[in-house]
Regions:
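Short loop/turn microsegments at loop-to-beta-strand junctions
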Residues: 8, 64, 105, 183, ...
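Amphipathic alpha-helical regulatory segments at dimerization interfaces
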Residues: 38, 89-100, 191, 245, ...
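Short, structured helix-loop boundary elements
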Residues: 9-13, 32, 66, 70, ...
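Amphipathic alpha-helical effector-binding/dimerization core
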Residues: 65-164
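N-terminal helix-turn-helix
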Residues: 1-83, 237, 244-248, 252
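A structural signal for short hydrophobic beta-strand segments in well-ordered beta-sheet cores
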Residues: 59-60, 107-108, 211
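Cysteine/selenocysteine-centered motifs that mediate thiol-based redox chemistry or coordinate metal-sulfur cofactors
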Residues: 157-162, 166-168, 244-254
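Extended hydrophobic
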Residues: 173-245
Length: 254
């Protein structure tokens, strides 16, 4: 079977998961011999997969030749846990904002070069057609929440994002020039909230405030979307208060 075939890739993945499951179910570290016996894989295959997992830090190779699950799994698990906690903590605040404004309230996180919508309070009365469903994505530089994440980057990371994506426009009002984007990010630092001025969708404006974790890094954003003519910039203060309350529950007291 060719190493490039889909069946081979699936087989390798299944064997990788099998070895990680065996390590997870063990009360202590296991030797290569133990793992080979329990997995029923030949020793060369088992050793090759374990080496790859060690390089990726999913598995730790201990003195004496034994193996145990690595700390990277804990890091990834904490990321998932934080995201679940954010949804649970944010939803009451989102409901209150929706009740007060009557507009669509979104909760989004960063994934790669996009934001992903993970929760929403919406009603037909808001008058905003929801184009991107829960799980939908949008570029960072075209969204209010995305700009919050960009404002959290250092200069090198920001330039890397710009070079990688090319910051293309979606509407005639999109921010697609680097200098203009830097000016907007500087304004976010000063005012504490971000604006999408019909940059993703014509006729829709958004306001957003950042949610921070205990390290003071942006982990999510809460946003309000409304028809352009109906947006009230005073709502930004409500968003900031809600985001601050959620951040405090996540351990951020900045």
């Amino acid at each position: 079977m060719s190493d490039e075939s889909p069946n081979y890739s699936v087989q390798v993945l299944e064997r990788t998961v099998l070895l990680m499951d065996i390590l997870a179910q063990s009360s202590g570290p296991l030797s290569l011999k133990d793992l080979t016996a329990r997995s029923k894989l030949n020793i060369s295959t088992c050793h090759r997969i374990l080496n790859d997992l060690v390089i990726a830090q999913f598995v730790e190779h201990l003195p004496g030749g034994r193996y145990q699950l690595g700390l990277r799994l804990l890091e990834l698990g904490n990321l998932v846990k934080n995201r679940l906690n954010i949804q649970e903590l944010a939803y009451p605040q989102m409901q209150e904002l929706h009740r007060k404004t009557g507009e669509t309230i979104n909760l989004s996180i960063k994934q790669g070069n996009d934001i992903v919508y993970i929760e929403r309070c919406w009603s037909g009365q808001s008058g905003v057609h929801v184009v991107r469903p829960i799980g939908g994505r949008a570029p960072l530089h075209l969204t209010a929440v995305g700009k919050l994440f960009l404002a959290d980057l250092d200069a090198v990371e920001l330039l890397e994002y710009v070079n990688k994506t090319g910051i293309p426009a979606s509407t005639s009002k999109s921010v697609s020039e680097f200098e203009r984007l830097k000016n907007e990010l500087a304004a976010i630092h000063q005012q504490g909230f971000a604006i999408d001025n019909e940059e993703l969708e014509e006729g829709v404006r958004c306001l957003a405030a950042a949610i921070f974790n205990e390290q003071g890094r942006v982990v999510a954003g809460i946003s309000l979307s409304a028809p352009a003519q109906r947006i009230q910039y005073a709502w930004s203060q409500d968003l900031k208060r809600a985001a601050k309350d959620i951040s405090r529950e996540l351990g951020c007291f900045l």
